[in-house]
Amino acid sequence: MSTIILGIESSCDDTSAAVIKDGYLLSNVVASQAVHEAYGGVVPELASRAHQQNIVPVVHEALKRAGITKEELSAVAFTRGPGLMGSLLVGVSFAKGFARSLGIPMIDVNHLTGHVLAHFIKAEGEDNVQPEFPFLCLLVSGGNSQIILVKAYNDMEILGQTIDDAAGEAIDKCSKVMGLGYPGGPIIDKLARQGNPKAFSFSKPHIPGLDYSFSGLKTSFLYSLRDWMKDDPDFIEHHKTDLAASLEATVVDILMDKLRKAAKQYKIKEVAVAGGVSANNGLRNAFREHAGKYGWKIFIPKFSYTTDNAAMIAITGYFKYMDKDFCPMEAPAYSRVTLAVSYTHLTLPTSDL
């Protein structure tokens, strides 16, 4: 009998559903929310309302594209955290009702684990080379910047992480200071391709170990702009592409410096990148350069698997299903939770759902 998993993702502002059958992706549907662009960032209440409107048609479309009826499902996997509580509750509540009505198990998935295991998403006829354990994964997004030692599907260790702002968060905030649109990351990426990455210099953190810090870079960028604009009020407009390229290059240098140290310290040559910022052209180029210079075997996900999506939730759910790792129907959502931590003993804020 086939194992068919429905994955549901609703941690932030993308409503997504996907179907995995025996480890192969059959469908992945994502509904994004343009409503937040006018506010320059995600508005939690608006995101939650949009999820409520989108969740049913998105799941229906995912099943339709997969050619699967709901009665054929083996389990429902859902993002339990981290994320925006109002958004998470929509996905968690739907998953509970859907699974209960079908009499099938529920599988809770850590959103961050899903990003890491996105490297194992594969579709029929798709040439997808997957990393072998153990490997290093740089997980970098708007909310997280971590270096992870991936020992197995269900065994991961955080070697280093940001002690303040995440890389994507710093880029978005600097983009906002420049008066660019939302989300800032893709806009900075596009502008950077036309600019000189060595045009401007911004401060880099000097902290021990493998942890990251991006708050200093954000402050350096802000103060530098303030000083330059005293002499030229239109400085940003005159140097937009060079500013973007220099900012991007600084972020990438910070990320790759600690990743190089981790690869050397743990003697690992298989290195992956995951998360929304992994779509950044500068970061991808840096990975390719390091592959040639240090003999790394690198793994860069498809663009469609870098941002939030249910395919990564479904594949993680599939691996957990094979281990019979289910969760109770009363499982709550968690807005804040770290990677590779058992939900059982958490005392973080929860919902009653």
Where are these regions (language model features)?
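N-terminal beta-alpha supersecondary unit
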Residues: 3-82
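A contiguous, well-structured pocket-lining segment that forms one wall/lid of small-molecule binding clefts
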Residues: 190-271, 280-294, 321-324
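Glycine-rich phosphate-binding loop plus the immediately following alpha-helix
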Residues: 113, 150-194, 223-226
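Glycine-rich phosphate-binding/hydrolytic loop that grips phosphoryl groups
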Residues: 115-117, 301-339
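Conserved phosphate-binding catalytic cores of ATP/NTP-utilizing and phosphoryl-transfer enzymes
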Residues: 109-135, 316
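Conserved phosphate-binding/catalytic loops in two-lobed NTP-binding clefts
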Residues: 108-109, 288-312
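Conserved small/polar residues in nucleotide/adenosyl-binding loops
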Residues: 344-350
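Short beta-strand scaffold segments in enzyme catalytic cores
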Residues: 15-20, 137, 145-149
